[in-house]
């Protein structure tokens, strides 16, 4: 029988970090259960190939939403990594911690000990920041963070246009000042994707006390209200991986609630409907699903300097060859090298809109490239009020769950997205883009009225692939909480959840960084260590926030 002190389900952002930290002192054995295969190969390791694994069943679980009623019945893909490193091996390699206020809101909502002062030391501990170490940034940690070269002049035009429009500039949105236009950070090292597997799991697996077990996690085995192991399917056989101390679920915001429900933890009525014996009635399991949505605002470029010139087989082959032999060139970046975090209106105290800018006009998944040279901004609101759910389709562990995001179900979502479109047009209309600006490709200059913008939003808004919140962390006496502030599943001993599913609220940006931080901090709770000393750093808040949006 396979057996270890700690059994972790999932080798993603949080799971890999926990495998590394729980085994670090050599006193405890760790087994990581992962259904996916190897991350070796250029399709994952070459940063510019980022859209390819998203569309491959080899690396992606292939989840999709139910038809979304507020998006004309569209079904939206929900990629989650089915590979060593989890979603950190198929994501966009964008590194965003989130705003300090995000974590303070977590604490206010019952996640005591997870305010910004508490989590900043863990962000610092995990970082190997190219820019060095200070009160805000870390250096020497497992996760390499860099900035792109920003050689293409369109990156500079985007940042300058933000300044011309009256917005702030920021040299480090992961430092004291998130608000503003500036460089974007990447989890890339030496021209390669630097996933959680590269940073944490592979170094951990070199230790004698860490093992990786390839298998499909069916459920957590619970006896007398205590988790004692995990039932897996491996080599077409059902096996048990026994946990001497604890089981930690880190299987993503989609799979983590599914595994809990299959184990008898969740809304009692829903479990009974599926013929599952109730171990712990936790109504919050699978609820509180959140995500970011975004639109692509695309503009023709009058100069042939965009990436559209290399979106052909011959150019891709040359780029691939240069990357393969030298780990350099256009293949060695994700091309997200300029960013912005801005506030939508006066009275909003910290940014609620995020921009990714790239010198190309093409969908994030690599499809539907524009016919001409172009550039685009990915833009979307960061704090949607819409909430969704993940439920069981059947008691069969192999059945994909029912995912209902309820995108755009709150009226404010529509107001915010209309503003995002109009604001992007204002930015692209600044003189910094005069030398490059052609016709608007998308939505198109004819799309102006609220009604027309709403049609465009309904037909074209996409997930930014940041699902979270389905095993919410909070007070033990809150019926909507699934785990307490030490990541312990309420009502079951020896069982924790630690990944993006425990976020009470979605953070202000991409989720890889806060997911890794969650694994880092959860490890100290699991080991019974005193948490790292809180920081006394104070974030920059725009002094004009009450009277101006910039």
From Swiss-Prot:
Residues holding FAD: 5-34
Active-site residue numbers: 466
CC cofactor: FAD
Protein origin, superkingdom: Bacteria
Family: Belongs to the GMC oxidoreductase family.
Keyword Cytoplasm (UniProt): no
Coiled coil feature spans: none
Enzyme class: oxidoreductase
NCBIfam families hit by this protein: betA, PRK02106.1
GO biological process, one term: glycine betaine biosynthetic process from choline
Keywords, comma-separated and alphabetical: FAD, Flavoprotein, NAD, Oxidoreductase
Reaction equations catalysed: choline + A = betaine aldehyde + AH2; betaine aldehyde + NAD(+) + H2O = glycine betaine + NADH + 2 H(+)
EC number, UniProt record: 1.1.99.1, 1.2.1.8
GO molecular function terms listed in the Swiss-Prot or TrEMBL record: betaine-aldehyde dehydrogenase (NAD+) activity; choline dehydrogenase activity; flavin adenine dinucleotide binding
Pfam family, any one: GMC_oxred_C
Gene3D superfamilies registered for this protein in UniProt: FAD/NAD(P)-binding domain (3.50.50.60), Glucose Oxidase, domain 3 (3.30.560.10)
Nucleotide-binding recorded as keyword: no
Pathway(s) the chain acts in: Amine and polyamine biosynthesis; betaine biosynthesis via choline pathway; betaine aldehyde from choline (cytochrome c reductase route): step 1/1
Organism listed in the record: Mesorhizobium japonicum (strain LMG 29417 / CECT 9101 / MAFF 303099)
Chain spans, region Disordered: 529-550
Protein name as it appears in the record: Oxygen-dependent choline dehydrogenase
Role noted for this protein: Involved in the biosynthesis of the osmoprotectant glycine betaine. Catalyzes the oxidation of choline to betaine aldehyde and betaine aldehyde to glycine betaine at the same rate.
């Amino acid at each position: 029988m396979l057996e270890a002190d700690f059994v972790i389900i999932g080798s993603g952002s949080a799971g890999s970090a926990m495998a590394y930290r729980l085994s670090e002192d050599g006193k405890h054995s760790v087994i990581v259960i992962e259904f996916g295969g190897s991350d070796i190969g250029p399709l994952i390791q070459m940063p510019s190939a980022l859209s390819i694994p998203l569309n491959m069943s080899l690396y992606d679980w292939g989840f999709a939403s139910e038809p979304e009623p507020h998006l004309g019945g569209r079904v939206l893909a929900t990629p989650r990594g089915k590979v060593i490193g989890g979603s950190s091996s198929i994501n966009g390699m964008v590194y965003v911690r989130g705003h300090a206020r995000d974590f303070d809101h977590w604490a206010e909502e019952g996640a005591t000990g997870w305010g910004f002062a508490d989590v900043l030391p863990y962000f610092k501990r995990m970082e190997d920041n190219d820019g060095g170490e200070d009160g805000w940034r870390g250096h020497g940690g497992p996760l390499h963070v860099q900035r792109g070269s920003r050689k293409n002049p369109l990156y500079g035009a985007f940042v300058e246009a933000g300044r011309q429009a009256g917005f702030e500039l920021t040299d480090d949105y992961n430092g004291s000042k998130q608000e503003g236009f500036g460089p974007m950070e990447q989890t890339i090292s030496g021209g390669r994707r630097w996933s959680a597997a590269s940073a944490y799991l592979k170094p951990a697996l070199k230790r004698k006390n860490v093992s990786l077990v390839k298998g499909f996690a069916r459920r957590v085995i619970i006896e007398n209200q205590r988790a004692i192991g995990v039932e897996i399917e491996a080599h077409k056989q059902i096996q048990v991986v026994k946990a001497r101390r604890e089981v930690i679920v880190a299987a993503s915001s989609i799979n983590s609630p599914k595994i809990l429900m299959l184990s008898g933890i969740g809304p009692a009525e829903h479990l009974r409907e599926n013929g599952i014996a109730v171990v712990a009635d936790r109504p919050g399991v699978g609820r509180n699903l959140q995500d970011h949505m975004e639109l692509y605002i695309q503009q023709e470029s009058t100069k042939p300097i965009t990436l559209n010139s290399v979106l052909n087989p011959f150019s891709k082959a040359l780029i691939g060859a240069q990357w393969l032999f030298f780990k350099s060139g256009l293949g060695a970046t994700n091309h997200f090298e300029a960013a912005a975090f801005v506030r939508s209106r006066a009275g909003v105290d910290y940014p609620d809109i995020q921009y990714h800018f790239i010198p190309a006009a093409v969908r994030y998944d690599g499809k539907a490239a524009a016919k001409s040279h172009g550039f685009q901004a990915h833009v979307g609101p960061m704090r949607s009020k819409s909430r969704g759910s993940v439920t069981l389709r059947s008691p069969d562990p192999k059945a994909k769950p029912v995912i209902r995001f309820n995108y755009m179900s709150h009226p404010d979502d529509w107001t915010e997205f209309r503003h995002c479109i109009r604001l992007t047009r204002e930015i692209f209309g600044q003189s910094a883009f005069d030398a490059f600006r052609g016709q608007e490709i998308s939505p198109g200059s004819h799309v102006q009225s609220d009604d027309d913008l709403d049609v465009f939003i309904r037909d074209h808004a996409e997930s930014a692939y940041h699902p979270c919140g389905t095993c919410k962390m909070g007070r033990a006496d809150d019926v909507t909480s699934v785990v307490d502030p030490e990541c312990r599943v309420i009502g079951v001993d020896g069982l924790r959840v630690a990944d993006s599913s425990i976020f009470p609220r979605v953070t202000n940006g991409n989720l890889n960084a806060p997911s890794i931080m969650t694994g880092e901090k959860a490890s100290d709770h699991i080991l019974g260590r005193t948490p790292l000393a809180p920081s006394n750093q104070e974030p920059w808040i725009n002094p004009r926030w009450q009277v101006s949006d910039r």
